[in-house]
From Swiss-Prot:
Chain's role: Transcriptional regulator. Recognizes and binds 2 copies of the core DNA sequence motif 5'-GGGGG-3'. Binds to the HMGN1 promoter and may repress HMGN1 expression. Regulates SNCA expression in primary cortical neurons. Binds to the COL2A1 promoter and activates COL2A1 expression, as part of a complex with SOX9. Plays a role in chondrocyte differentiation.
Protein name: Zinc finger protein 219
Taxonomic classification: Eukaryota, Metazoa, Chordata, Craniata, Vertebrata
Residue spans of biased composition, Gly residues class: 390-404, 634-643
Segments for region (Disordered): 1-21, 137-160, 215-275, 384-495, 542-648, 668-722
Matches recorded under SUPFAM superfamilies: beta-beta-alpha zinc fingers (SSF57667)
GO biological process: limb bud formation; negative regulation of DNA-templated transcription; negative regulation of transcription by RNA polymerase II; positive regulation of chondrocyte differentiation; positive regulation of transcription by RNA polymerase II; regulation of DNA-templated transcription
GO CC terms in record: membrane; nucleoplasm; nucleus
UniProt zinc finger (C2H2-type) residues: 57-79, 85-107, 163-186, 189-212, 274-296, 302-324, 498-520, 526-548, 646-668
């Protein structure tokens, strides 16, 4: 097909394959004289002219033309010795574009490196390279001009008259369009006094300072430059200058753009810092400070008098004050009302102001009357009240261990009689307060101990008197504001009734405060029935019994049982004709069966004995009486001197440890164990429970004693479940 086309006699098929420039002439001359040479020559000239107009980018090495500059750049890489990238400033040539960029940075070291500046630099490089190539192409085309190639200048003539962008070589129909393009893309910052334009705001500022010498007006021009309103005025000015010669325009622009490059370090000074009035942090911009102030939106009403830091909540300030107390030690923190230098002050007043509820509060010496007249700064904030009876604490000297600076923390902890007496007779206040406090604390501890633990040999009359003393002690506590669980008449931190009046510690509940008060009063209500041990908590006594009296807990103790509590503290009076029943015994965990019921229950009753220890009251504010964990002898007195021996109700097994008995019942006499054994194994008569040192009872005695117990399986496993 390719060889048949040039042989065709028709003239319109000859110029159809004009894709090969060199081969076309050879095929044309080999066709013979049949083809009209004139027509072919005219067609060849017209085709070559059209092809030359399309391929406007010739190679400077081999002369080959290309349609696009990018293809020419790729083609130049094929020439080993050619370096297509040339520096427009010094003529340096580079084989790659990246190398030329690195070289151009040496000419403009202080040019800003923003993304827009990089883009403009790249566009300038491309424009300069295009101009260099076009210049070389024109020079080579002029030297090798022939009649066939003279027509190459015809399609290039209109390009010279078009309006080109000096940066990106874009074509525009009118000069206004080109100026608009330059202003939007390449020169957005324009001077309001001349036709200078730049792509960077720093360059415009430098131009305004150097050319016009008015720093105020360029700042106004820069602030007004970004809005599009003042922009349409300058474009008509450069119109008559850019129309005649658009090509040499990059030369002055090239000179103008690098000149403001060293203006970066000569920028106007930064605006003054914007400082936060709350925390003191400074910012360079106002909107940074505005965003920072969002953190301080909430009210900071509680300020530290030492460092000035503010807090939202009062307890934050209190925790913060501990830091200053640990750092400053005995030094006093400067308060807001501190004035000129005064007489030497007590060194530990500042520490007490920071820690008003700590133990050091009770050890602070009393300050001078001049210091008490000062208005309180932190003391009022920390709920410390002035001395009662005199304004600003101007009364007589208080006790050395109970006040500081005329202020008394937790003043409701003192007896009401002492406070009244202090207000009436201020001259004897110190001795009276000390005596009242000692008497009050001693009487409170002794009265509570006497009411809890009556001495043996005391009759019901003494019990009634003890109950009356306990009631009077409770009334005194209510008067002094020390009743556990009650509220105090005065406000402040002590109004919850959970602060210790001795050391000032705060507790979460009234029970914790009650247990803590036993440390100061020496009260130990939980006494061991087997030895002289006494504990402040029931858990301490339980641990003591488990560790030292485990064998004695299984049976009756060797000594006589302790005296029962007075009848006034019992929930119900004992029945007539019966001796006073002992305190209820709490069964040991894991025991095989509970003790037989009291004599009041019928012989055939299966009702479990009640535990009155959980319901009885001791008359101290409606609180439950502590459990008695000791074991008492049964009604028959079957316990021997050596403790009880636990015998199995189903087999002859016996042991002195209740834990082993419970394990034996679970392994050998549970439902699962009975299911594995033959039925005659369970038909054996049960063995009664016999103390150690005695023989098993007869079957008749078993029937009599077993009538008062529940069924064997229930008795054995019921105690284990408990």
């Amino acid at each position: 097909m390719e060889g048949s086309r040039p042989r065709a006699p028709s003239g319109h098929l000859a110029p159809s394959p004009p894709a090969f420039d060199g081969e076309l002439d050879l095929q044309r001359y080999s066709n013979g004289p049949a083809v009209s040479a004139g027509s072919l020559g005219m067609g060849a000239v017209s085709w070559s002219e059209s092809r030359a107009g399309e391929r406007r980018f010739p190679c400077p090495v081999c002369g080959k033309r290309f349609r696009f500059n990018s293809i020419l750049a790729l083609h130049l890489r094929a020439h080993p010795g050619a370096q297509a990238f040339q520096c427009p400033h010094c003529g340096h040539r580079a084989a790659q574009r990246a190398l030329l960029r690195s070289h151009l940075r040496t000419h403009q070291p202080e040019r800003p490196r923003s993304p827009a500046a990089r883009l403009l630099l790249e566009l300038e490089e491309r424009a300069l390279l295009r101009e260099a190539r076009l210049g070389r192409a024109r020079s080579s085309g002029g030297m090798q001009a022939t009649p066939a190639t003279e027509g190459l200048a015809r399609p290039q003539a209109p390009s010279s008259s078009a309006f080109r962008c000096p940066y990106c070589k874009g074509k525009f129909r009118t000069s206004a369009e080109r100026e608009r393009h330059l202003h939007i893309l390449h020169r957005p910052w324009k001077c309001g006094l001349c036709s200078f334009g730049s792509s960077q705001e720093e360059e415009l500022l430098h131009h305004s300072l150097t050319a016009h010498g008015a720093p105020e007006r360029p700042l106004a021009a820069t602030s007004a430059a970004p809005p599009p309103q003042p922009q349409p005025q300058p474009p008509p000015q450069p119109e008559p200058r850019s129309v005649p010669q658009p090509e040499p325009e990059p030369e002055p622009e090239r000179e103008a753009t690098p000149t403001p490059a060293p203006a970066a370090p000569e920028e106007p000074p930064a605006p003054p810092e914007f400082r936060c009035q709350v925390c003191g942090q400074s910012f360079t911009q106002s909107w940074f400070l505005k965003g920072h102030m969002r953190k301080h939106k909430a009210s900071f009403d509680h300020a530290c008098p030492v460092c000035g830091r503010c807090f939202k909540e009062p307890w934050f300030l209190k925790n913060h004050m501990k830091v200053h107390a640990s750092k400053l030690g005995p030094l006093r923190a400067p308060g807001p009302a501190s004035g000129p230098a005064r007489a030497p002050q007590p060194p530990d007043l500042g520490l007490l102001a920071y820690e008003p509820l700590g133990p050091a509060l009770l050890l602070a010496p009393a300050p001078t009357p001049a210091e008490r007249r000062e208005p309180p700064s932190l003391l009022g904030y920390l709920s410390l009240r002035a001395g009662e009876g005199r304004p600003n604490g101007e009364g007589a000297e208080p006790g050395p261990g109970r006040s500081f600076g005329g202020f008394r923390p937790l003043s409701s902890a003192l007896p009401a009689r002492a406070r009244r007496h202090r207000a009436e007779e201020p001259e004897e206040e110190e001795e009276v307060v000390e005596a009242e406090e000692e008497t009050w604390a001693r009487g409170r501890s002794l009265g509570s101990l006497a009411s809890l633990h009556p001495r043996p040999g005391e009759g019901p009359g003494h019990s009634a008197s003890a109950a009356g003393a306990q009631a009077r002690s409770t009334a005194t506590q209510e008067e002094n504001g020390l009743l556990v669980g009650g509220t105090r008449p005065e406000g402040g931190r002590g109004a919850t009734g959970k602060d210790c009046p001795f050391c000032g510690k705060s507790f979460r509940s009234a029970h914790h405060l009650k247990v803590h008060l036993r440390v100061h009063t020496g009260e130990r209500p939980y006494k061991c029935p087997h030895c002289d041990y006494a504990g402040t908590q029931s858990g301490s006594l339980k641990y003591h019994l488990q560790r030292h009296h485990r064998e004695q807990r299984s049976g009756a103790g060797p000594g006589p049982p302790p005296e029962p509590p007075p009848p006034s503290q019992r929930g119900s009076a004992p029945q007539s004709g019966a001796k006073p029943s002992p305190q209820p015994a709490t069964w040991v965990e894991g025991a095989s069966s509970p003790r037989p019921p009291s004599s009041g229950a019928g012989p055939g009753s299966r009702r479990k004995p009640a535990s009155p220890g959980r319901t009885l009251r001791n008359g101290r504010g409606g609180e439950a009486e502590p459990l008695d964990l000791s074991l008492r002898a049964g009604p028959g007195g079957e316990a021997g001197p050596g403790g009880a021996l636990h015998r199995c109700l189903f087999c002859p097994f016996a042991t002195g440890a209740p834990e082993l008995m419970a394990l034996h019942l679970q392994v050998h006499h549970s439902r699962r164990a009975r299911g594995r054994r033959p039925p005659q194994a369970d038909a054996s008569p049960p063995y009664a429970r016999v103390p150690s040192g005695e023989t098993p009872p007869s079957p008749s005695q078993e029937g009599e004693e077993g009538s008062g117990l529940s069924r064997p399986g229930e008795a054995g496993l019921g105690g284990q479940e408990r």
